[in-house]
Amino acid sequence: VGQLLGDPEAEVRRVLVALDITEAVADEAIAENCQLIVSHHPVMNCKWLPVQTVRQDTPQGHLLLKILRSGLSAICMHTNLDVAPGGVNDALAAALGLEDPGPLGDPEGLCRMGTLASPMPLQEFAKHVCRALQANGVRYAGDSGPVRKVAVGGGACGDYEDAAIAAGCDVFVTSDLSYHQFLDAAGKGIRLIDAGHFPTENPVCTVLAEYLRGRFPGLTVTKSASHREVIQYYVEGE
């Protein structure tokens, strides 16, 4: 994490904020004459993007070389933004309209929990999650009883399911859940909603852009318009 690409001494006037640094995001930054991209997910040296070579004929190498040749720098975060006050999970709780949000279990842990102003059936809450996060669809499982106390974990936070149960939550909103996690949830007494990795983390980009504008008023800070959810859903009958 930190500055992963670029010149630490370079002057910065325009900043682009995005969840991921993709080819489209890099092209947008170049077109907007930005000097810096700030992202949540690292563009290199993480478990899903290990850097062994930087070659023009590989997708990752092509992206990294484009960034460097354009004079762009990249500052990337990850779990530090997940856990930070006002970070990924606080932004997710706010996007869902949770009241009295607080840590889920460990005071310094990643996930958050809060309550809905009024209880609602699971299906209605799943629809609310989908619309609030502007997701293309959500997966959910559990009985249709009322939902009031909600745990949230942006990104792949399925490992915190037991913490949500221990806290007495009615439902856990996260992403990247497996078939067996859904299957086992009923026996554990918890409802699950998988709203997707991008939709559960993307709300923080708006928060981060606003924070940077306030912290550095001399900079022009823009949230990426080109980075969108890549996963689509086909539902029979639609």
Predicted regions and their residues:
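Active-site catalytic microenvironments in core metabolic enzymes, especially phosphate/sugar-handling
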Residues: 1-238
